[in-house]
Curated annotation (Swiss-Prot):
GO biological process: ribosomal large subunit assembly; translation
Listed PROSITE patterns: RIBOSOMAL_L20
The name this protein goes by in its record: Large ribosomal subunit protein bL20c
Family (UniProt): Belongs to the bacterial ribosomal protein bL20 family.
Swiss-Prot/TrEMBL keywords: Chloroplast, Plastid, Ribonucleoprotein, Ribosomal protein, RNA-binding, rRNA-binding
Cellular compartments per GO CC: chloroplast; ribonucleoprotein complex; ribosome
Length: 117
């Protein structure tokens, strides 16, 4: 029997995966089986860390707001500020409040002092 040459489809699929992992180190960018595993792992990590990224930033914003608010008033905290904002129906999200805490602290103090009264 004569030898039959394989098609190009499997090679094309592997090259596509190889392009994805070309920046990986060592065998993770050379060996086909390892490449496939690393691609799955990378895509899974990217999917998982998109939510984790949002969670971490929200936590950072809360910490910044709390630190700035506690500097201003002794018995005032983040939770009471947010509660008062909701009661007054002020639409300021945590990201904006954290930016105010860093860039324009006096403005944040004005808002918080207005909430206390």
């Amino acid at each position: 029997m004569t030898r039959i040459r394989r098609g190009y489809i499997a090679r094309r699929r592997r090259t596509k995966i190889r392009l994805f992992t070309s920046s990986f180190r060592g065998a993770h960018s050379r060996l086909t089986r390892t490449i496939i595993q690393q691609r799955i792992k990378a895509l899974f990590s990217a999917y998982r860390d998109r939510d984790r990224h949002k969670r971490n930033f929200r936590c950072l914003w809360v910490t910044r707001i709390n630190a700035a608010i506690r500097e201003n008033a002794v018995s005032y905290s983040y939770s009471t500020l947010i509660n008062n904002l909701y009661k007054r129906q002020l639409l300021l999200n945590r990201k904006i409040l954290a930016q105010l805490a860093i860039l324009n602290r006096n403005c944040l103090y004005l808002i918080s002092n207005d909430m206390i009264k």
